[in-house]
Every structure is written in structure tokens, then in C-alpha cells.
Amino acid sequence: MGGSCAQRRRAGPRQVLFPLLLPLFYPTLCEPIRYSIPEELAKGSVVGNLAKDLGLSVLDVSARELRVSAEKLHFSVDAQSGDLLVKDRIDREQICKERRRCELQLEAVVENPLNIFHVIVVIEDVNDHAPQFRKDEINLEISESVSLGMGTILESAEDPDISMNSLSKYQLSPNEYFSLVEKDNPDGGKYPELVLQKTLDRETQSAHHLVLTALDGGDPPRSGTAQIRILVIDANDNPPVFSQDVYRVSLREDVPPGTSILRVKATDQDEGINSEITYSFFGVADKAQHVFSLDYTTGNILTQQPLDFEEVERYTINIEAKDRGSLSTRCKVIVEVVDENDNSPEIIITSLSDQIMEDSPPGVVVALFKTRDQDSGENGEVRCSLSRGVPFKIHSSSNNYYKLVTDEALDREQTPEYNVTIAATDRGKPPLSSSKTITLHITDVNDNAPVFGQSAYLVHVPENNQPGASIAQVSASDPDFGLNGRVSYSLIASDLESRTLSSYVSVSAQSGVVFAQRAFDHEQLRTFELTLQARDQGSPALSANVSLRVLVGDRNDNAPRVLYPALGPDGSALFDTVPRAAQPGYLVTKVVAVDADSGHNAWLSYHVVQASEPGLFSLGLRTGEVRMVRALGDKDSVRQRLLVAVRDGGQPPLSATATLHLVFADSLQEVLPDFSDHPTPSDSQAEMQFYLVVALALISVLFLLAVILAIALRLRQSFSPTAGDCFESVLCSKSGPVGPPNYSEGTLPYAYNFCVPGDQMNPEFNFFTSVDHCPATQDNLNKDSMLLASILTPSVEADKKILKQQAPPNTDWRFSQAQRPGTSGSQNGDDTGTWPNNQFDTEMLQAMILASASEAADGSSTLGGGAGTMGLSARYGPQFTLQHVPDYRQNVYIPGSNATLTNAAGKRDGKAPAGGNGNKKKSGKKEKK
């Protein structure tokens, strides 16, 4: 052979596939010339002008003896025109059988010089076959007990045409019992399935006759029909069931005849004859029935003839399992014929580094290997691949050598080692492959700092805890390995003083357990915050910090302390006077107590333990207010005694007691004779009383002078004097705490001061501002309340008219329900209180009370309850419990009158009570002053 390929053109109206221009490697070989013609073309039909496509002239056709050759010659060349003509009948289904692409290969030969050209004629399918069922009549037996939706596979039709001309769809004649469903075979075909739509009744209709039509996709479409005769039989409930709907098996084409390829198995849950199963082919092509055989009792499939991959690549076999009760089921067996490729590739590792640093950059060589396949051609060409999900890739080197390199960053903490599987696959059909797995260990680098289990820790520790006990534990994890992951703990900061931190807490370096070094006191230290650090042992070391907040919880370790009533300096009990005309509900006095604890432990309740007249008084459970239950009777004693117990809300509760001495009298003068039956004082006591009377007389004179002087000074000054200053130091008394002598040892020490102006005509107390300037020695008023009464008596006698015009309580300062502070709203007059909503509200209210009490103790706030203060007298102050924080003056009354503290304050400031009917003239005088 010699020469070159001529330029080719497309000739004729038929479709011609153009070849490439010239061969790439060998000048004597050309790309094939392609023609496309439909099957069943008439003899003598022109396929194409072969001479023209080969670049030959008309004269060259005969001169160079253009001709074609093939195993079976279906074509010839016209010696005059060079046209390629149809010589014999071309039936695509006969020539190519089931292959979808049908091609006939020819060799065009020319002489002088000798050249051979490859010609391929593609045979296109035409719709020359109608779908056809293997049987014109399909007989089915269906039990009347079959449930709705039960499907029965029908025999599929066969159409040797392909593509659009092949079998397209099925149709079923209209009926009310059955419908038709088309399903796809794995090989791309379709098969019909009869689905029951209405329950069968053999007694009503014992047989059904239907027509099944198969249509192809040609234009116009062709069709084939089959008659379906359905016999309804009595119940056989369970049809056979195959273990699989589709069986797949691969066979090498060189297996000998008689080889068992598969055994299908169906089971039937019925008993007796209905469970005996037989197997048979169903709708199988003749070719498949010649190649395979089926044992009808065992379901074993055997080969009968040698397999030929080039002729048939796949067989689809439908097998029906039927029991003796006429129920059946079907399965498909797909047999793949495998071309012979009997040598798998080999992988040989030549170099391997199994230890890799986790900070290695991409591109580091990990291993070298080569592949080898003893096959030749495409079966010996090998390509390599890696298992998915590994950070490596393969670089091809040369002569079947490869490098395994890193492809991305490594992380030992995420994956400490990799099992890398290298797969080698040849290009055979089907390809053979082999694999080799290598294990790569990642070496740790200290690239992870410790991480605490929580962003912040919060622990609650009850007070009075055991020193040395564990109060908390922090935990940090480090995913690194060895020393890089070993964590130690330490304290690095705190809101406590650094010098005293070690005396409060310590932390275990190994376990992170935090120990208390002392017993905590909630009243002294309620909360503190620590900063702990976790550090690994790497180089360089990495660390992390976390905050630990410790809340010291309260325990009921403080008993209530009674502030009022209190004992006198000599230990004697004071008394309160009650008007004889006091009506039910009248506020007699109030028991005032505090508790240094917080929360429920400071929630106080008041109980009457003993009373000289049980039905005369009532005691507020939460307020401590003593009120009249009924009016004083003629048979009731004017001297009453109440023993009151104050309990907190702790578990178990702690308590304290107080004794109230009440005397019913309209004035202090009536009270003094009641005490005349006391034992006659000794001479020393009488002498002391004489000096006291003289001193009080002098004080009264000085008091009057001080009043006159104060009036004169006020008239001279253009600005108002400091409210509440005492007019005369000798008349100003500074009293210390009236609680128990050791009450200052508690957490809430208080001191209460009050002044008594001499010009006050009403028998009531007035509370002014701080009196720190009062001399400490002037405490006579606190020593004996009886002396105070004797001082006030002349003033009372001097102005009885004013006493008769007593002003009612002032209401202009009282809080509304929405204005009252605290968590429980207004303070009602009942015996129950309202608990705070939560610990925060409780501590907030207690802090307000503590701050106000501290002001009173320091003398920086008025005892009259001025703006922004809660200062109050020892006798009529509120209880510092947590249930209410309203203005206390609305519930505190001066025994012996209907006036409240607000009346006194208003009169002192020159203001008349709202809605009152008091002495307007006197109020006017004060305003003038």
C-alpha cells in the first residue's frame, strides 16, 4: 500500500459522515468513510458516490478498478459513476440482532497504486415490525381474596425495532376491575402489570375477558394484541415470594455448558398444596431459552450453550414461581456476560514514610510506588486512584511510577492516622483492579490551646462551709498528644485582695478542684470572682483563662433581734400608753425586729406567746403591729402585758421574744398614780429623784428661753434655718441603740436620735435632722420615759384646746399602689405579707434598708423620715424585714393621739395636713416663724 488519502466530500441526498482529513501517524491509513442508510432499502439504491468521496474522477473508477470487499457483501460499486449501491436485502434485525448500533464495515480498494479505504455503513432502523406477544391468549387465575392494588405481571410484547420504533406503551380494554401499569425493565424495556382496582367476587363473576394492546413509537404506530382471560378462584391467600425482585449475575464468556449460574428461591407461607412451588420461564426470548435451562422444581439455572460476549452482552430472564393454588409471582434474572481479562494490576511500594508531621505543607512526598499488569493492550494499561476522604493525591511520574504527596493541611487531633487505599485499575472490559492499603501516622505538634468545658463557671457555696472542702471543679481539655495535651491549673487573678487570696481559696494543679481555705460568712462576703488558667506542657506552652464566680449562700445563723420594745438602761421595761377610748383596729404600738440573714431566713413573723387579756389585742403576723380587737371593757385591767415571739423563715427557724407593757390612760398624769403601788424607793433613790426634778425644772426654764431666742433669730434671718436643729443642747437627747446591749455585734448596727422641742404643744414626738451636735451626756430622756412625761405635762395642761382640735392624719404623702417600692405592693393591714419575687429582689430591698439604717446610725439623715431616708426612732421604727418597703409613717402612730409622724413633720415645717381640721392658727404661726 502507498500513496495518500484524497480529499473527500459528501455526495448524494443521503446522510454521510465525513472522515478526518489525513491520518495522524501513518500516511497510508485514513479515517473511515461513513454512510447512513435505512434498512430494507431497495436493491440498486445509491448509498453514496464513493469515488467522489475518495477524490477519484469518473475515469479513475474503471482505470483504478474501484471495488469493495467484505465478509458478506451487501454493496457494490457502479463501474461507470463510482456510486456505492445496495446489492442485497438489508434487514437490520437480522444483521445486528439486539445491538442498538448497527454498522457494516467495508474496504474500498483501488489499484495503481494500491490503496485500501475503510468504509462504514450505518444501518438505521425503520418501523417494519409491529409489537407481538408470544401468545395470543393469556390465561390468569386470580383468587377472589386478593387485596386491592395487587399487581400481576403480564407477558411483555417483543418488537425487534429499536429507538422510537420499538415498543412504546401498553393499553388495556376498559373495565371496572383492573387497570394497567407500565414498569421499566433494567435493560430499558417495558412490561405491563395488571393491578386489581375492585374486589373480585367469584360468585358474582367467575371470569373476566380483557384485551391487552402493545403499541410502538413509530409514525404511524404499529400495534399487537393479546387476549387476557382471568379465572377467579377461591382463596389462596399467600402467593410465592422471591427473595429478590431482581437477580444479577456476571458470567465470563468462557464458562463451559452445564455451569450452574444461579438458583432462584421463592417461598410461600401457605400450607399443603398451596405451598408447593414450581418455576418456569415467562416471556423469555427464544435465544435465552436456548442458552439457559431452568429446573422447574429447584429454580436452578444452568447454561446449555457457550456464551458469546460479542453476540449478546446481557440476558434478561423472567422467571415465574407458581404454587399449587394458582398464585404466582415473578422475578427477573439479569445475566451479564463478561469479556475475558484475567490478570489484575499489581501495586509495588518502593519507598514509604509512615511518620508525617501534622504541620507539613501540601506537596510533601509520602510514598513512592509503581504498578505492573501482565496483560497487554488496553487490559495492561493501568490508572491509579485513592480512597475518598484522605488529604493526599497521586502524581504520575514516568514508566508506571507514582508519587503519593500531601494535598492539604493535616490535623492530628481530627485524624491521628490515615489508612490510605491505593487502587490500580486496568482498561479492560470489564476492568480488573487491585488495591493496597498503607497506614500513615501523623506526628503531633502543639497547635491547640486548652479549652474549658464552659465559658464561665458559677458555683453556690453555703456559708459556714468546712475549711478545706471542695467547692468547685474546672476542667479543660487539650486535644494534643503527650505533654502537648497535659493540662495544669492555677489561680491568676481575683477581685479579692491578692495578699489574702491564698487564705480564701486554692486550686489543685492536676485536677482543677477548687478548695475553700476558710469558712465563708454570707453577711461579710456574698460573692467573689476568680480567674483560673489552664496551661499545657508544650513548647511553647499554650494557655486559656476562665472566670469562676462564687456565690456565698445564706444560712439561718442569725436569730432575730428586737429593736422595739427595748429595755431601759437600768434593765426595766418601758410601757406604752393607750387611749381609753381606743376603738377596734386602733394601732397601739408596733414590734420592730431585724434579722442579719437574707432571703427567707430574714422573713420575720410575729406571734403572741402570752397575753394578760387574750381577746383584747391582735398582732400582725408580718407587720408586728399591735391593734385593738375590741374596746376596753369595764372589767378589763388598765395594765396589760403581751409576750411576743419573733420567728424568722429559716429551717429550723430562730426566734426572739419581747414583752409589751401597755397602760390605758388618756394622759401621762393618769399613768403616774398607777405606779404608786410600787415599793417605796430607798433614801438614795428618793434623793436621786429630787435632783432629777430640780434638773428638769431648770431644763424647762432653759427650754423656754431657747424657744424665745430661736423665734428672735428666725425673725432676723432672711433664710430658713437648718431644719431640725435643737434649740438648746441641754434639751436635746442623744440615745444609743435601744435594742439589746450586744446588738452592735451583729451585721446591722443602728443608732436612733431624736430631739424634743419645748414649744411643741401637742403630746406627740417630732423627728428632725441629725443631732450630732447634741452632747453625749444629755441622755436623760432615754433613761426614764416617765421623766419625759413629766416634762411634757405642763405644755399639755397649758393648751387643752389645741389638744381637742387634734388634726387627722395627713394623707398627702402616702404612696399609691403603683408608687410604693418593694416587690409586694402596698402594705395592707392584714396579718399576712408578701414574699419577695426572687433572691435579687430580696437582697436589693435589704440593701436599701441597710443603707437607710446606716444613715440613721451615722446621724446623716433625719429621724422624721425626710426625703430619701428611712431613719426612724427606736420605738416607732419599722421592722427591717423583706416583705415591704413603703413609707413607714403611714402605719406608725403616736400612742395617746390620732396623729401620725406626717402630722408632726407637717406641723414642724409649717404645713397643714391634707384634709385635716387641726389648729390652723398655730400652723400659721409656724409659717410666720
From Swiss-Prot:
Membrane topology: Single-pass type I membrane protein
Glycan-bearing residues: N419, N545
Composition bias type Polar residues, residue spans: 807-838
Compartment(s) where it occurs, according to its Swiss-Prot or TrEMBL record: Cell membrane
Cellular component aspect of the GO annotation: plasma membrane
PROSITE patterns from the UniProt entry: CADHERIN_1, CADHERIN_2
Single GO biological process annotation from the record: nervous system development
Record protein name field: Protocadherin gamma-B7
Signal sequence range: 1-30
Biased composition (Basic residues): 919-929
Transmembrane segments: 692-712
Renumbered residue ranges of the record's region Disordered: 806-838, 899-929
A UniProt-annotated Pfam family: Cadherin_2
Keyword Glycoprotein attributed: yes
